[in-house]
Amino acid sequence: MSLKAEEITSIIKSKIANFTPQADINETGTVLQVGDGIARIYGLKNAVAGELLEFPNNVKGLALNLETDNIGCVLMGEDSSIQEGDPVKRTGQVINVPVGDALLGRVVDPLGKPLDGKGPIKTNSSRPLEIVAPGVIERQPVKQPLQTGLKAIDSLVPIGKGQRELIIGDRQTGKTAIAIDAILNQKNQPADQRTLCVYVAIGQKQSTVAQVVQTLTEFGAMEYTVIVSASAADPASLLYIAPYAGSSIAEEFMWNKRDVLIIYDDLSKHAQAYRQMSLLLRRPPGREAYPGDVFYLHSRLLERACKLSDKNGGGSITALPIIETQANDMSAYIPTNVISITDGQIYLESGLFHSGMKPAVNVGLSVSRVGGSAQKKIMRSVSGTLRLDMSQYKELEAFSQFGSDLDKESQQQLTRGKRINELFKQDQYTPMPVEEQVLVFFAGTNGFLDNIEVNLVKEYEKQLLTYFKAEKKDLFEELKNAPEMSENLTNKLKEALTAFGEVFKNSHSTAQ
């Protein structure tokens, strides 16, 4: 078959007309130096701060230092496979994390990859790691309570939805235990109104995270919880982005009109990871060798917790950051920074913890700066004088150790203080509904415990709740639904507590 010259010409012309160039244009750079999870890259002149870079073997990096002739980049994976001279590509993207309901009940790393062996996470939604926190107009004041189920906190250091409340104390004083109890207590709410929880483990041992997962699963709390884990074995870069990833996951729920509780456990290790990265990137060190912007590191994170205005859906993020102190020193750099950013702190003391006071909340140094306006009126009516009573009791207790003779009124204060102090004690994983707390504190502050031996207070509390649920159902229900303590309700409670006092006295006199 012979082709004519015109046909050949027309074929060539059509091929030229339909030709589309397939060249893949990539801006690439070269690795100059790599080590300790840091790479220096030559080239990539148009890279922006915070951009995701792609290395060989599917390792990702985050551009942090943009210098005149090179880029300082932290690696999001193992650096042993990267060599000097390797090509590096720009992605033109910032880090995004998968978000949405598909993450509930899952354990993920800060990049959203599953760690629980339950298969891939099926979600099409993602959010950038870092966003600007909502502005003043987009927010509303904190006015709804968030119950933790812990008597010492809900009565004296109340937390509101949208608040940032710091949990601070030495190692092994029960900081994580408070956070886990707060998560467990959200199970008491109806499923459609339940506060969702995000637990961010930063630099924790993997065995500790496994223990948290097991506890939450046992109590049925994993179904409304997401765990973001950057363990002690992970690179500092993953520890650095973990809290921001947790915050992005929480924000998706918040903008969908949900309430979220997020726990950062703990921000001391987060600051240490950032210090490590900054020193390796040759940024100038400041106080305690932390970089100059370590305050901004935490302030931009914690400002993302808020209560949105009704116009924006009214969702909220309540943050409970945890800080570990050394030898009860709250005046160190990171603790003072985070105290000044948050809306109050729950201070746990090792001395109290070892003396058997659990949770070991130091009532004098713990404060909630905005939660008071969110506390339920009925709780405020019984706990209003508690803080003053407890501080007077502590003062008297110290004074009475000198063996001084005390007048009758002071002895009365000591007697009541000892018993109320006993009421603050609570076992782990036993969060208490607010109506039970109100009943117990009402009994304590109105003198119904004054004639009970201190070692029997716990037994009294247990039997009191059982008695009310069985014998005084209607009154207990009325207490549960009452917005505030009316005179009628007060009289009914006093009557019922007097009757129970006789029952308790008789049961113990016969037992003896």
Curated annotation (Swiss-Prot):
Its EC number is 7.1.2.2. The lineage of its organism: Bacteria, Pseudomonadati, Elusimicrobiota, Elusimicrobia, Elusimicrobiales. Transmembrane segments: none annotated. InterPro entries: ATP_synth_asu-like_sf, ATP_synth_asu_C, ATP_synth_asu_C_sf, ATP_synth_F1_a_nt-bd_dom, ATP_synth_F1_asu, ATPase_a/bsu_AS, ATPase_F1/V1/A1_a/bsu_N, ATPase_F1/V1/A1_a/bsu_N_sf. This is ATP synthase subunit alpha. Belongs to the ATPase alpha/beta chains family. GO terms for molecular function: ADP binding; ATP binding; proton-transporting ATP synthase activity, rotational mechanism. Keywords: ATP synthesis, ATP-binding, Cell membrane, CF(1), Hydrogen ion transport, Ion transport, Membrane, Nucleotide-binding, Translocase, Transport. It is found in: Cell membrane. Produces ATP from ADP in the presence of a proton gradient across the membrane. The alpha chain is a regulatory subunit. The gene is atpA. F-type ATPases have 2 components, CF(1) - the catalytic core - and CF(0) - the membrane proton channel. CF(1) has five subunits: alpha(3), beta(3), gamma(1), delta(1), epsilon(1). CF(0) has three main subunits: a(1), b(2) and c(9-12). The alpha and beta chains form an alternating ring which encloses part of the gamma chain. CF(1) is attached to CF(0) by a central stalk formed by the gamma and epsilon chains, while a peripheral stalk is formed by the delta and b chains. It comes from Elusimicrobium minutum (strain Pei191). GO terms for cellular component: plasma membrane; proton-transporting ATP synthase complex. It is a peripheral membrane protein. The record marks 366 as: Required for activity. It comes from the Bacteria. It is an enzyme of class 7 (translocase). It holds the Pfam family ATP-synt_ab. ATP binds at residues 169-176. It catalyses: ATP + H2O + 4 H(+)(in) = ADP + phosphate + 5 H(+)(out). Disulfide bonds: none annotated.
